[in-house]
Structures are given as C-alpha cells and as structure tokens.
Amino acid sequence: MRFLNIFLFFAAIIAFATASQVFEEDEIDMEPRITCDLIGNERLCVLHCLAKGFRGGWCDGRKVCNCRR
C-alpha cells in the first residue's frame, strides 16, 4: 500500500510538470491597449516602453503604442 501511494505521488508530480510545460509553450501574451487611449496619450506609451526596456515609443493612427528599439 505504501509503495502504491509513493508511486501515485510521483506519477502525479510528473504528469503535472509535463502538463505545465505544454501550457507555457501555447500561452499567448495578450496585453491591453490602453496606453494610447487614456489621459496623456503618448506619455503613457513612452512610460510603458521605457518600463519594458525600450528607448521610448509613440501612438500611431490606430491608437496602438509602438516602442522604439
């Protein structure tokens, strides 16, 4: 009985670990597009890009923030 419990414990850990790896590969990073719509327009876009490590950014005609490299 003890061997069965240990076996099931390790089988559950392995199943969980492999399921997590597959999920991370299929995950899409969706970010809301609110930096160009709120008060300050391009200021929030520039701050957003600076926080991500870029040199700045601007809002295009579709109100989408574009970061400079």
Swiss-Prot record:
> Gene3D superfamilies, per this entry?
Knottin, scorpion toxin-like
Predominant cellular place of this UniProt entry's protein: secreted
Record key words, sorted:
Disulfide bond, Ion channel impairing toxin, Neurotoxin, Potassium channel impairing toxin, Secreted, Signal, Toxin, Voltage-gated potassium channel impairing toxin
| Domain text | Has the structural arrangement of an alpha-helix connected to antiparallel beta-sheets by disulfide bonds (CS-alpha/beta).
Family named by the database record: Belongs to the asilidin-12 family.
Q: Which organism is it from?
A: Dolopus genitalis (Giant Australian assassin fly)
Q: Name one GO molecular function term.
A: potassium channel regulator activity
Q: Which residues form the signal peptide?
A: 1-19
One annotated GO biological process: humoral immune response
Pro-peptide positions on chain: 20-33
Q: Other remarks on record?
A: Is abundant in venom, since it accounts for 45.2% of precursor counts.
Q: According to its UniProt entry, what is the function of this protein? A: Moderately increases Kv11.1/KCNH2/ERG1 currents and shifts the voltage-dependence of the channel activation to hyperpolarised potentials. In vivo, induces neurotoxic effects when injected into insects (tested on L.cuprina and A.domesticus).
Q: Name the Pfam families on file.
A: Defensin_2
Q: Does the keyword Secreted apply?
A: yes
Query: Where is this protein found?
Result: Secreted
Free-text tissue specificity from the UniProt record: Expressed by the venom gland.
Q: Which GO terms describe its cellular component?
A: extracellular space
**Disulfide topology:** 36-59, 45-65, 49-67
Name listed for the protein in its UniProt record: U-Asilidin(12)-Dg3a
Q: Does the keyword Signal apply?
A: yes
Highest rank taxon of the organism: Eukaryota
